[in-house]
Amino acid sequence: MKKSLVLGVIFSFLTISWSCHTKPNHKKEVPILCYHNIKNFSAKASPDVKAYTTTPKRFAEQMKALYQNGYQTISPDKLYQYLINDAPLPPKPILITFDDTRAEQFTLAVAEMDKYHFKGVFFIMTVSIGKPGYMTKNQIKILSQTGHTIGLHTWDHTAVTHYTENDWNTQLIRPRKQLENLIGQPVDYFSYPFGLWNQNAISKLRAENFKLAFILSSAKDKTHPEFTVRRKTIAGTWSTPTMLK
């Protein structure tokens, strides 16, 4: 009797542990959009430019369409609580994210988002701060102070798959501290350059107590899906109906 009881307790514990451990992998994915450049481009632009650039007019159309279709932006904090702790989400939640620190994300995108009370997640590449075409320190502070989330996109956009052990301080630890000192808030979220990741990167991010890390549209890690949260890159050639799908 005692042996059966003990085995039952062990089985129940393992079942609960396994369920909690794998929970994020079985969650319905929240749509997450990823923008880079927001500017006009010519029909002769390179495929890369077209893939990572959205015109201001198209971006405005997309924000309006999201609002008209009932979408509500959520913070990565809310996404984390949903994935890890089963916290409820509002109807039609969405995250709007931005990579690379581009100045027009502040000067153009935020103005459009403000019309609909949308908040975004801005992943900052710290080497670019204050350079021509990129956000200033003050603009990043304003984003944080007005309800947007600041995340880390490494120091100089080198893919994490190329790092040696010595690179992590340069690319992850110091830039994170720089951003935290700038905004006076924890920086708990990370975006992989080029969407590329490996197991070593996941181990490092976990060791540094990041909550979530974001990729693009590649496959998630089965063991730690919260460190490979997928996003949809919005190409400049997409129509607004395509973006909504």
Report each predicted region and the residues it spans.
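Positively charged n-region of N-terminal signal peptides that target proteins for export
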Residues: M1-S4
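Bacterial N-terminal signal peptides
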Residues: G8-S17
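C-terminal active-site subregion of NodB/CE4 polysaccharide deacetylases
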Residues: H21-I96, R102-E104, H162-K245
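A short alpha/beta connector and helix-capping loop motif
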Residues: F106-T126
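Acidic (Asp/Glu)-rich catalytic clusters
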Residues: V110-H117, M135-G151
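Short beta-strand and adjacent tight-turn residues that come in two discontinuous sequence segments
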Residues: F123, H153, A213-I215
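Charged helix-capping and loop-helix junction motifs
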Residues: G133-I140, D167-Q171
